[in-house]
Regions:
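C-terminal outer-membrane beta-barrel translocator/porin domains of Gram-negative envelope proteins
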Residues: 257-388
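Solvent-exposed, glycine/polar-rich loop segments of beta-barrel outer-membrane systems
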Residues: 246-248, 256, 333-344, 403-415, ...
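Outer-membrane beta-barrel initiation region
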Residues: 19-175, 251-276, 357, 404-410, ...
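Gram-negative/organellar outer-membrane beta-barrel architecture
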Residues: 97-261, 266-269, 337-343, 348-359, ...
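Bacterial Sec-dependent N-terminal signal peptides
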Residues: 1-22
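Outer-membrane beta-barrel transmembrane domain signature
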Residues: 313, 364, 368-372, 380-423
Length: 460
């Protein structure tokens, strides 16, 4: 009798899990500019595929996330319907709301390692303005072209044609960038765990021109291999070498160099802008050599991220970043570790910790204070691409630890070769056009504490 009851209760569940649906049609609307093939090649299924019933919702969720991660759409809706001609067939309906793709480039950059450090110094001269244009989704193919002129703290230019997909499956992607930067200020050493700058009055401290080409192979939608080759010509003032003879490894004021980088990424996060579930594995090999082969440098860098929902409101995540480098000469420019790029410790925004090897670990507990809201801004009725806005707010608590090893540290850098820790609480505001605003109240083991601010993915 018990066996019969168990079979009676669970047989429908088993039969449902074994049911298969065939994708008979894929309908797309809302893509006024974006080509349909750009959308279909990001889907984890294609017309004619068979999907198990118990896997269907997860597959549709992945399709939605893949399309949002293109950064081409503010909203994506993926729905299913039973084909009227056959109950085992499904029609997939995809409705997208495109972003604005053509931007006059008016970009204000606060020239510091982070916004909090710039606010502390309040140096109005440390601002660079970019003026030009940037076009996303060129020809509806998700290509990006940009041209800009820099003035202010840095002067220079940038020309780029990037994200050029080759083939129907977007398995091969190319990018080209030409870049020039001319600055009268340069960070030439770290003292007391803070970057020290030399400001030249009459001449440029650093003049840099570079050209790079990168190629990406995507064997899967969320897995990529990238190779980048860069040629660079740099001229520095002799003052830099007088202030720090070990600035870049030799006594030349002019250098031509080649860089070769390889990057592997497996990005299984649900949403690239503000992930809450999934993981990221990133590994990077960097190689650098000047053209007379007297200065050589290599680095292995890794980044592991993991995101886990604990409930509808609570999430936990962890970020582990590490790097190990080798070089044949002592050079300050190759020793930048904690406080640069993605190796950060919240609460140490005002400090850097140089070294040849480093590791940082950043676990965070998050709580969804305000679920995602969608509002229509009627006063922007003349700008339909900006009128509909979404936003959500998360509270968070965090505890960071890190360590950087320096083989020949400056005696003034009191954080060298020490385990560091910090903690705090904060708020994150996430909204459209990939805008993330963060306010943290952090403290560190130096008994310092305060508010810190950051802005990611600015609108322009």
């Amino acid at each position: 009798m018990k066996l019969f009851l168990i079979i009676f209760l669970f047989a429908p569940v088993y039969l449902y899990s074994q049911q298969n649906y065939c994708i008979s049609n894929i309908y797309i609307k809302g893509n006024t500019i974006t080509k349909s093939k750009v959308i279909t090649r990001e889907l984890p299924f294609k017309q004619g595929d068979t999907i198990r019933a118990d896997k269907l919702e997860g597959v549709l969720k992945m399709a939605k996330n893949n399309l949002l991660n293109l950064s081409l759409f503010n909203f994506v809706y993926v729905k299913k319907s039973i084909n009227p001609d056959n109950s085992s067939n499904l029609d997939i309906n995809i409705d997208v709301e495109e972003r604005w793709f053509i931007w006059p480039l008016i970009d204000i950059k606060f020239e510091d390692r982070n916004l909090s450090n710039w606010i502390r110094t309040s140096d109005s001269k440390r601002i660079t303005l970019d003026a030009g244009f940037r076009i996303y989704n060129l020809w509806g193919l998700n290509h990006t072209v940009s041209a800009s002129y820099k003035f202010g703290y840095h002067k220079g230019f940038r020309l780029g044609y990037e994200n050029i997909s080759i083939g129907q499956t977007r398995s091969h992607v190319l990018g080209f960038v030409v870049f020039g930067q001319f600055s009268k200020t340069e960070n030439f050493i770290s003292l007391f765990n803070s970057p020290v700058y030399n400001r030249s009055v009459n001449e440029f401290a650093v003049k840099k021109i570079s050209a790079d080409i990168n190629y990406t192979y995507r064997p899967q939608i969320r897995v990529s291999h990238t190779v980048m080759i860069k040629y660079e010509n740099i001229n520095i003032s002799d003052t830099i070498l007088k202030l720090n003879p070990k600035y870049w490894g030799n006594s030349d004021t002019t250098r031509n160099s080649l860089s070769l980088n390889y990057i592997f990424i497996s990005d299984q996060r649900d949403n690239y802008q503000y992930p809450l579930e999934g993981y990221l594995i990133k590994g990077e090999l960097r190689g650098y050599v000047n053209t007379d082969y007297t200065v050589r440098y290599g680095q292995l860098r890794t980044n592991l991220q993991y995101y886990l929902p604990l409930s509808d409101k609570w999430n936990v995540c962890a970020n582990l970043t590490s790097g190990i480098s080798m070089k044949n000469v002592q050079a300050y420019i190759f020793d930048r570790a904690i406080g640069y790029e993605d190796a950060t410790l919240r609460g140490y925004e005002f400090y850097v910790n140089d070294g040849q090897q480093f590791v940082t670990f950043n676990p965070t507990l998050k709580y969804n204070i305000l679920p995602t809201k969608v509002s229509v801004l009627n006063f922007l009725s003349f700008l339909p691409k900006f009128r509909k806005i979404h936003f959500t707010i998360y509270g968070k608590a965090f505890f960071d630890i890190g360590y950087s090893h320096h083989s020949y540290p400056n005696i003034s850098n009191f954080l060298s070769n020490k385990f560091l820790c910090s903690g705090g609480v904060g708020l994150d505001l996430i909204t459209y056009y990939n805008i993330n605003l963060s306010i943290d109240y952090s403290f560190n083991q130096l008994k310092e504490h305060g508010f810190f601010f950051s802005i990611k993915s600015l609108l322009f």
